[in-house]
Amino acid sequence: MINEIKKDAQTRMQKSLESLTHAFTRIRTGKAHPSILGGVMVPYYGADTPLSQVANVTVKDSRTLQVVAFERNMLAAVDKAIQSSGLGFNPTNLGELLLISMPALTEETRKGFTKQARDAAEDARVAVRNIRRDALSQLKDLVKEKEISEDEERRAADDVQKLTDKFVAEIEVAVKQKEADLMAV
């Protein structure tokens, strides 16, 4: 019973960390990377479809992405979707493909992206702490039902706290790395 609670908490904390990593891929650094366009949705036969399902996104050079639509007639829709995505990109349509130049990040935009990264990290920390709280309340319920002793509950609570500390430290490392990437010129 205790092991199941700890394993569930660990799994959920790992998912929070993965979610943070995924959120970080959406935050632009100065370098071109296909995952920046991961959230772009393109209208395709009446339904919004992820860009990756209607076009191939590759890195042409360190500051340029190349987008090739699987169907040539979709290029205009892909262009419009990228422009309206709120990412601040203005693709160049070359007829068969789109080129997206990554504008150099100004100090102001770097600070804004750093703030976004910190906010995402704080959300992940809160999620990890909520998972800890849920696990501790499950342990307390087991004590109330006399399924485990208070000593077992205390030991399990210490283990859950160690898990929490480990994942919060991993979140810290991830946000420091992202900040370093953002501030590198």
Curated annotation (Swiss-Prot):
This is Ribosome-recycling factor. The keyword Transferase does not apply. GO terms for cellular component: cytosol. It comes from the Bacteria. Belongs to the RRF family. Keywords: Cytoplasm, Protein biosynthesis. Responsible for the release of ribosomes from messenger RNA at the termination of protein biosynthesis. May increase the efficiency of translation by recycling ribosomes from one round of translation to another. HAMAP family: RRF. PANTHER family: MITOCHONDRIAL RIBOSOME RECYCLING FACTOR PSEUDO 1, RIBOSOME RECYCLING FACTOR. InterPro entries: Ribosome_recyc_fac, Ribosome_recyc_fac_dom, RRF_sf. GO terms for molecular function: ribosomal large subunit binding. GO terms for biological process: cytoplasmic translational termination. It holds the Pfam family RRF. Its main location: cytoplasm. It is found in: Cytoplasm. NCBIfam families: frr.
